[in-house]
């Protein structure tokens, strides 16, 4: 992140992670501190930022890379603080309720777009691998558009908007209508 800032280049972040292991070792390894540092650095970065949610975005690490100036998502991507199976196991002591938990969490791109977490959705077929070249071209066009748009705005305009986006993440309406 800092290198992009030092070189005066926009930062492009790709989010595609199943999340960290839910283990004592992960916590003892300083995961929470790294997530906090990433959030802090990204929010205050003095260069335009674009996050691209490609597939799964699970856990604090994925969420820490979300408050960019603009977020692009593949149509079938999803984002959650905890994978729906994990949430189901915690709440219901069974993974059988993962689809219901997914719906309640509003993890799909349609919900993320409606709630203002994603600004740009890139169309993909049932499996982007079936049309990899066309998908990559659409994704490239989306990235080019967002970077070009951001390059026209001064940092004095981008930073307050980025901070506002981050501060209001928890205040958005989720898919089941609850604020």
Specify the residue positions occupied by each region the protein language model found.
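C-terminal alpha-helix plus adjacent terminal tail
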Residues: 146-179
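A structural preference for short, pocket-lining loop segments at secondary-structure junctions
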Residues: 1-22
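Proline-rich intrinsically disordered, low-complexity coils
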Residues: 10, 83-84, 160
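Conserved catalytic cores of soluble enzyme domains
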Residues: 15-144, 148, 152
């Amino acid at each position: 992140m800092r290198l992009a800032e030092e070189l005066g280049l926009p930062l492009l972040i790709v989010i595609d992670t199943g999340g960290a292991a839910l283990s004592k070792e992960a916590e003892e390894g300083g995961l929470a501190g790294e997530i906090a540092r990433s959030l802090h650095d990204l929010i205050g970065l003095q260069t335009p930022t674009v996050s691209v949610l490609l597939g799964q975005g699970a856990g604090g690490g994925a969420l820490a890379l979300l408050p960019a100036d603009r977020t692009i998502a593949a149509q079938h991507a999803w984002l959650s603080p905890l994978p729906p199976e994990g949430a189901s196991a915690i709440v219901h002591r069974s993974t059988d309720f993962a689809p219901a938990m997914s719906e309640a969490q509003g993890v799909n791109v349609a919900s993320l777009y409606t709630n203002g977490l994603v600004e740009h959705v890139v169309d993909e077929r049932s499996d982007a691998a079936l049309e990899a070249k066309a998908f990559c071209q659409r994704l490239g066009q989306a990235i080019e558009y967002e970077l070009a748009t951001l390059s026209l705005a001064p940092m004095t305009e981008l930073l307050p908007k980025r901070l506002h986006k981050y501060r209001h993440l928890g205040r958005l309406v989720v898919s089941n209508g609850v604020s």
